[in-house]
């Protein structure tokens, strides 16, 4: 840095104090989160100079010199230097955790030991004194840095603070994580008022178990890398996949479900009102409110922020604020101009510049370095000139919204002049002829005035009821007040005027209204003429009015308040005596104005009254202002007491004022305008103590005067900046904002302004920032890789000489590179490579669940950038892939080791652990492994999109590590144990679902490993089922079970289980899969054949026991056997053989069909045999059959016994017998039919209830019905020539009626029931019924005729004749049925 020190000893001391400081920097705007919007190019480029801020940096890289320097220091200074020990480059963050703490705790004691320093051990008092000295020196240094930062905050001119950065979210800390877990626990227990359905509760349960309770999440929370937004995004992505996979619900969109779930999630995570209020109170206690930390901050807020960062106390800030006049923009702009002038002067001294020039990687860069310094200074000057001229207290860098000081024409003139002066200033260092010549129009002023007429006193010549008013006139423009009564002449009327004359004339006249017809104007009562200046007092004053000659008032006064608003370009004005060579050649008192045309153009102008343009003016460029300790007697005799002068080569101006304080104000204003390095000092005989002197005395009292008066060029701003940046980063990391290393807009704005104003080398800034960020990353904090990427790319472009900023380049695009920058960059590059490889290796734990978003992808991109040899040549893809492959190989070991530690596999490999427990442990480990790989694909697959094959190799390596434990667990399994099959199914299903792992090394290994086990298991199951068939059916009781008997259910359950097992295996190899299918078909066919054969044999045995009487009931065992056959048939479908487009029934299926048909025929035969037996019994009642005649006697008593009773005259007995005879006869005649109906009903109910195949039962019923009707019809056809007896008729009627009704209830089709056969039977039975009624009627008629004994013979003859007639009619009727 220019003028950083005056001797080699001071250089060495200063450099050693900063040997161990971190090196970092921040990229403009993009690096610092977009906090700057430069007005023009920054003067601190990567290649541009730090105005020799790198004072003797080449010495700092020499270890030998550092050692010699340390040994030559005092014990206190040696301890201070040695306490800052740099960390090893290759050391990882886990090693840092312990080593750093030990180094920090023991640095003060170890350094002071006799072994280390070669002297006696330091006492406790000396150590405390040394510690206090170090703290005092650090605090002084912080105060000095704060002074420079305060100047940057007070008057920024290289950019402005913007709020276009991405707003950072609130950080989730350990306490907040515990509260969030507690809220979710309460929700899952149902102790909240949040309504939720089962699906949402399951989603929350999964989120709680997988995410919130994850140890990885807890570690990242401790690292400050998670915000509530990250928590919400993880939940949103999780439920989005769930909801999107669900089928659509009519009337309910999936977006509505998602929004509802997210609203409930927000309600859970925020808690109730009590929790929210507690959190709000906790944040409000924070010194810097987290809600506004990333907002655009005002100056006072920025002061407060950096007071906290640097540990500056409020009173110290106030001292610095007052001493530096931070609220005075003119003073701040003047200080900047003085800084530039000092740097330009140092630049013109080749000898000094050569001594202060740092050591470059190429010797020829020294000349380029000088050009960069000059270019940077000119850039700063250009930036300063773009700042509009402002008044004291106005916001720098922004024009006023409403200004009455300038017209539109004046502003356009000012802007054009600003451009002219700006372009001229860029070349002023190269040529003295480049000065800008001002014109009178450039220094014109535009003032605004406010004239307020308040009241009049002494008005007695006017009647109290008269109306009076006032007029105001400035430069010909008149305004009038309101009317008032003469008794109370008071107003509150303000007149606004604008003028270009700094010495305006204000005329105020008092009038009274004259209502006379002949009066042309009102009467003037008095007037006053005021000549205000911009320095006049703003308080109201009483003025004596000039009265007309005829006025009767003696002492008429008016109270007027006048305020003249100074324009922004008028910096000071007042009356002075002046004489000069080129202007104001006569010593006289004139009204002077100091006018600022631009930031670098000032002029002293003299004005006269009623003249808008200056009479004369001189541009102050090149003048030096100073006090004149002694007055000029010759000039003081003509006027003026206190002198000061402005001197320039070829011209000299002498000024004098009547007031000493006025002189001091003029000197200070001119001193600010000239930008001179020399500060005028009041003469000793001065009795005026200026306000600034009081502030400096107060600063001196607190020991801060030296740092306040120090010149900025005497400090190494590179290392100052690195310290400020490091402390700011520490402060930012500790904020409740999830910053990931990004500065807030306010912090970034101030740091950028500092680096630009004091020309900190760009590469040095970024290297320092990289070092700080890597230190934070090594400490376990989470840093955004994009932030590191920006800085690294900037440094790489600078060091390799390929930059993309034309305005910051030297000749042919090459910039200066110091030796220290290159060495630090190589060191950072190696540290960064190690860190990135470590993060990629631990990607699941550094970036859990893919958060922060895009961080892993950015890390991979940054690794590729780090591996590049230079900026132009891209790194070969194979080299990048080799590094990532190695990282993922290590990641596989890390991930599986952590899973084993979590499952405690190593501890459970002892002898006391059973083989079954080993398999259970492996199943649990397998679940962890599958979940891990699924998470990798879900959360990190996108980041590894360009390296998907490497991620697949990582998974294979992961499974290869797993296979070692798998083999160990399988080796201890017994020969007849099949507990490992679920493990294979789990692995196989997952591997088949992953296209990258399907058919891979591990997949093929487990297939070959489990194939013999599968074959042995199926063979064993086949033998077991065959034995179960033989033993089971020999003892079977044929009790109904679900779809068969106990033995068949057991057999088929085993077959189904085996079949399901083979299907669930989902064997990946096609040949063995076909073998398993064929094997299962063969096995199933054999077992079904055995079951059906045994069942059919038992069925045949049971059916041989059947009887043909109505007492016989079909056994339920037979129905169970039929069910077994149907169960066998349903399973026989699985062994059908596919052949092209057709399906052919297997032999087994045909056999079962034949058996079922045979069983159906057998049952029908046995059931039909009972009907045949009944019909045979009824045939014995035929007419003409002797046995039938005997059997028919009972049902026909009316022909004999009724006659006897009638002849006996027992009429009462006859009536009773006649009434009871039909019922008794019917009951005795229908016994045969009722017994068959009972048999029929029991069989149908049994068949319907027990047999499971309703179709088969319906078919059986239909055939049985047809056969019954056919048999009955044939039986009746055989008896067409004879009528049925009562027994035959009643039995058949009962049988036909009940059979019809029962089969109708059983679901037989109506059309089938009403067949022709049934109709024929019905007609015959109806005819028999009619015949029976006729016979009964004939019998009843003969009974009535028997009361007359004489006619008994005639009645008998009549009955005989009727009988023959009926028989003849019957013969004719029966002939119709043939």
Curated annotation (Swiss-Prot):
Keyword set for this entry?
Answer: Calcium, Coiled coil, Cytoplasmic vesicle, Exocytosis, Lipid-binding, Membrane, Metal-binding, Protein transport, Synapse, Transport
Q: Which GO terms describe its biological process?
A: cellular response to carbon dioxide; cellular response to salt; chemosensory behavior; dense core granule exocytosis; egg-laying behavior; exocytosis; larval feeding behavior; locomotory behavior
Looking at the record, which segments are called Disordered? Answer: 1-138
Give one Pfam family: C2_CAPS
Q: Where expressed (tissue)? A: Within the ventral, dorsal and sublateral nerve cords, it is concentrated in cholinergic synapses. Within the ventral and dorsal nerve cords, it is not concentrated at most non-cholinergic synapses in the nerve cords, such as the GABAergic, glutamatergic, and catecholaminergic synapses. However, within the nerve ring, which contains a large number of interneuronal synapses in the head, it is clearly concentrated in regions containing large numbers of non-cholinergic synapses.
Where is this protein localized, as stated in its record? Answer: Cytoplasmic vesicle membrane; Synapse
**Polar residues: bias regions:** 51-63, 70-95
Q: Which SMART domains match?
A: DUF1041 (SM01145), PH (SM00233)
Cellular component annotations (GO), alphabetically ordered: axon; cytoplasmic vesicle membrane; dense core granule; neuronal cell body; presynapse; synapse
Compositional bias (Basic and acidic residues): 123-138
Its domain comment says:
The PH domain is essential for regulated exocytosis and binds phospholipids.
Q: What is this protein called?
A: Calcium-dependent secretion activator
Source organism (scientific name): Caenorhabditis elegans
The gene for this chain is unc-31
